Amino acid sequence: MSIESEDKSLKWIMIISFIGLIDAIYLSYLHHLVSAGGGCPTQDLPGLDCGVVLASDQAKLFGIPVAWLGVVGFLTLIALSLDRYLNMDLERTYYNKILLPTTGIIGVVFGSYLTYAEAFIIHEWCPFCVVAFVLTIAATFFCISEYGYEIKELFNKNGIEKET
């Protein structure tokens, strides 16, 4: 991994995560709007009523709207990548190289469940939720392509790798 490659990847992670943050904030607003009895901009499109999705049981985790979790997830990716970008020479940002792909993977796993729920439980699609999921996958791709070896090295150091 070169400094230029890492620099480029971090910029992409920040750009993608910023767009995801805007989408997640909008989803949080829509969640509030739907909870207050309002509608969703896609409610007249067959199969694409985000209001139905945001009013479903799957739209909350322990009473917290999952859109808020998206805000936290994208903010975390932005903060970790910005910290690493500004302080590449500092040893303390080493952990950001572990936390970035880990955060992304958690987001992809959770987003996969939510996308499954849209398709097979709710039977409606929320276009803004799908955008958030695609952006999560894209940011995670850059995180893993740049720092995946760090996680592998961490497992190797701790003797977690299979012995052959």
Residue map of PLM features:
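Membrane-interfacial helix-loop segments of redox and metal-homeostasis proteins
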Residues: 2-164
